[in-house]
Amino acid sequence: MPEVTLTTLHGLKAKGEKITMLTCYDATFAKAASQAGVEVLLVGDSLGMVLQGHDSTLPVTTAEMAYHTACVKRGNEGALILADLPFMAHATPEQAFANCAMLMQAGAHMIKLEGAAWLAETIRLLAERGVPVCAHMGLTPQTVNVLGGYKVQGRQEAQARQMRADAIALEQAGAAMLLLECVPSELAAEITQAVSIPVIGIGAGNATDGQVLVLHDMLGLSLSGRVPKFVKNFMVGQPDIGSALAAYVKAVKDVSFPASEHGFSA
């Protein structure tokens, strides 16, 4: 497919066409996913769980993220590569900049940071220095111990109000994209309308500008055996992985995925 850039993603939002994203950790799947038309490949710190077998993303290091980003780059055929900054890799803006540089040198086009309004200073510094940032809000797995587990965020009105304000603040600080995880569908829709940058959802309903899933989840592979509510197994009824990836792209584009049963209410 033609090379996907940040401008491409903003254009898709402007046209009302959904953006497709999947996690990806190696060259083989990068080639398969990009050939299927997946526009954004997320080198997620979820690799700590699905590849390394940890029970959280916390043990993943920046060096490991750079290694997998480089692998994805070698197989990619035109998708935009988004890489996660792992746990405690952005404790200060300066530390964040150094670690972002490592990931971008490995092949990332954009960096994803987990957090809320407190990230504004860091995002502003990164944006000023040429690092496009995707801010990850809602359920942020790196803070799972503070959140008390993997729970839907934003169900209480005060929390929802704060999340809306934080999204606007992060866009104003220079965030180029938002990712909302496990957020009530109605709240995700409101945030998507409140900002001009693309908003990607996972467990956030179908009114966001695009969708992302963990690659292994949508292929029916689960190390733990637990399948999140927002996941659909796209291998069902498909002859091969390439067909499953293409089915995911089609379902996101025609808004048949996610369906109502994949989302959360307030």
Curated annotation (Swiss-Prot):
Subunit record text: Homodecamer; pentamer of dimers.
SUPFAM superfamilies hit by this protein? Phosphoenolpyruvate/pyruvate domain
Q: Catalysed reaction per UniProt?
A: 3-methyl-2-oxobutanoate + (6R)-5,10-methylene-5,6,7,8-tetrahydrofolate + H2O = 2-dehydropantoate + (6S)-5,6,7,8-tetrahydrofolate
The UniProt family comment states: Belongs to the PanB family.
Return the InterPro entries for the record.
Answer: Pantoate_hydroxy_MeTrfase, Pyrv/PenolPyrv_kinase-like_dom, Pyrv_kinase-like_dom_sf
Annotated catalytic residues: 181
The UniProt keywords, alphabetically, are: Cytoplasm, Magnesium, Metal-binding, Pantothenate biosynthesis, Transferase
Q: Which cofactor does it need?
A: Mg(2+)
UniProt protein name = 3-methyl-2-oxobutanoate hydroxymethyltransferase
Where does this protein act, in terms of pathway? Cofactor biosynthesis; (R)-pantothenate biosynthesis; (R)-pantoate from 3-methyl-2-oxobutanoate: step 1/2
Keyword Membrane carried by entry: no
What biological-process GO terms show up in the record? pantothenate biosynthetic process
Query: Pfam families, per this entry?
Result: Pantoate_transf
**Parts of the chain that traverse the membrane:** none
Q: Which GO terms describe its cellular component?
A: cytoplasm
What EC number(s) would the UniProt record show? 2.1.2.11
Name the principal localization, coarsely classed.
cytoplasm
Per the record, the gene is panB
